[in-house]
Swiss-Prot record:
Pathway: Carbohydrate degradation; glycolysis; pyruvate from D-glyceraldehyde 3-phosphate: step 2/5. The gene is pgk2. GO terms for molecular function: ADP binding; ATP binding; phosphoglycerate kinase activity. The keyword Magnesium does not apply. Substrate binds at residues 28-30, 44, 65-68, 122, 162. This is Phosphoglycerate kinase 2. ATP binds at residues 337, 362-365. It comes from Methanosarcina acetivorans (strain ATCC 35395 / DSM 2834 / JCM 12185 / C2A). Keywords: ATP-binding, Cytoplasm, Glycolysis, Kinase, Nucleotide-binding, Transferase. Monomer. GO terms for cellular component: cytosol. It is found in: Cytoplasm. One of its GO terms (biological process) is glycolytic process. It is an enzyme of class 2 (transferase). Its EC number is 2.7.2.3.
Length: 416
């Protein structure tokens, strides 16, 4: 079944002889939907086309989820199958079942080249329980579906940080590897965090302060980055930690988001990595939606909301980014929804595409990249969300670890 080829610590499509085989493919097609059930953004659906094209000689059974219980968009996979049919150029059959007789009958009757979409896996209550791969392998879903398929491929990087049934359970009982989305995410993020050309710069912003500080600590401690440049709310937290009076309104916002406790963590990182963390020299205040440039030494208790990095900081940061070989961006530099305060974000994006290898970590900055029409100028744009952040922060992802374990099993089997 296997064609020995990979030098990585996980298997990919290229390691399998997939002709005529039945492939269970876990994808991530979780998409925003309107109240009528129409998909508003099909990016994640389109992202799996390359994987499916490479599996055309096989029978492909898709496992996916949409939203989660209690949400208004927690619905069936029927609209996803419809859109996927259009993009794939052939029928993707929606099956209103997960592992019952109806689903198994469809799988057993498939011919080479067929693609079916099983029902939302989160309709099954055990799916979202966080358990070990061995425990997940002992569930009804795995026991019922596994005998009908030959190979499991995980292409759902965005849920790789979850130890959910459909993410880790099948790797225990089936030959398992990564689909093209998963493969590209792991190779690209690994290069950004570990093997990128130097100098390597991380530019972190947005409103999720704890995530940015986790990533900062990991990449500076591990040597994955030479420098980290801070923007957005995390920069405000770091400025406060460094002794700058950022103003009551800005401190109140930090407190309202539950990030006051992150000031001490930022202080510790600044003390440990003083010369490797870049902070803004100036900022842009929002005066009734008008941009007002202020040096940080001029900030005081009455200062207006900080909505962007200042012009001097933009020049400093973009010069440093342009002279780097590897650049990883995560989170916008300011309130980019307001045109006057999108300047820092846009200039950083334009500078990043001039580096040899550039990564967008996802989130709101991806929206700004699309707004500028520069998606294809980046080496990689992650669709991982929380999984991407955890990976950049050095966390082990259950979905990835289960693929590594499957690879070890394969290596051990070779020795027998």
């Amino acid at each position: 079944m296997l064609r020995v080829m990979t030098s990585r610590n996980f298997l990919t499509i290229d390691d399998f002889d997939i002709r005529g085989k039945t492939i269970l493919l876990r994808v991530d097609m979780n998409s925003p939907m309107d109240t009528q059930g129409h998909i508003l953004d099909d990016m994640r659906i389109k992202s799996h086309i390359a994987t499916l094209k490479d599996l055309e000689s096989a029978k492909v059974v898709l496992l996916a989820h949409q939203s989660r219980p209690g949400k208004k968009d927690f619905t069936t996979m029927k609209p996803h199958a419809h859109l996927l049919s259009r993009y794939l150029g052939k029928q993707v059959t929606y099956v209103d079942d997960i592992f019952g007789t109806f689903a198994k009958t469809h799988i057993a009757s498939m011919e080479d080249g067929d693609v079916i979409m099983l029902e939302n896996v989160r309709f099954y209550s055990e799916e979202s329980l966080e358990r070990t791969p061995a425990e997940q392998a002992n569930t009804y879903m795995v026991k019922k579906l596994a005998p009908f398929v030959d190979i499991f491929l995980n292409d759902a990087f965005a849920v790789a940080h979850r130890s959910h049934l459909s993410v880790v359970g099948f790797t225990e009982v089936l030959p398992s590897g990564a689909g093209r989305v998963m493969e590209k995410e792991l190779v690209s993020l690994d290069r950004g965090v570990k093997g990128g050309e130097r100098p390597s710069i991380f530019v972190l912003g947005g409103a999720k302060v704890d995530d940015s500080l986790r990533v900062t600590e990991n990449v500076l401690t591990s040597g994955g980055a030479d420098r980290v440049l801070l923007t957005g709310v995390v920069a405000n937290v770091a400025l406060a930690a460094s002794g700058v009076n950022i103003g009551k309104v800005n401190m109140d916002f930090i407190k309202s988001q539950g990030y006051e406790n992150q000031i001490e963590k930022a202080r510790g990182l600044l003390a440990k990595f003083k010369d490797r963390i870049g902070l803004p020299k100036d900022v842009a205040l929002n005066d009734n939606r008008e941009r007002v440039e202020v040096h940080i030494s001029e900030l005081n208790s009455d200062s207006l909301p900080i909505n962007d990095i200042g012009l001097e900081t933009i020049v400093d940061y973009t010069n440093e980014i342009q002279n780097s070989k590897t650049v990883v961006l995560n989170g916008p530099a300011g309130v980019s929804e307001i045109e006057d305060f999108a300047l820092g974000t846009h200039e950083i994006i334009k500078a990043a595409i001039k580096s040899d290898f550039s990564i967008i970590g996802g989130g709101h900055i991806s929206v700004e990249v699309a707004h500028l029409g520069l998606e294809h100028r980046f080496s990689h744009i992650s669709t991982g969300g929380g999984a991407c952040i955890d990976y950049l922060a050095g966390e082990k992802l259950p979905g990835v670890e289960s693929l590594k374990a499957a690879y070890i099993k394969y290596q051990e089997a070779k020795k027998l």
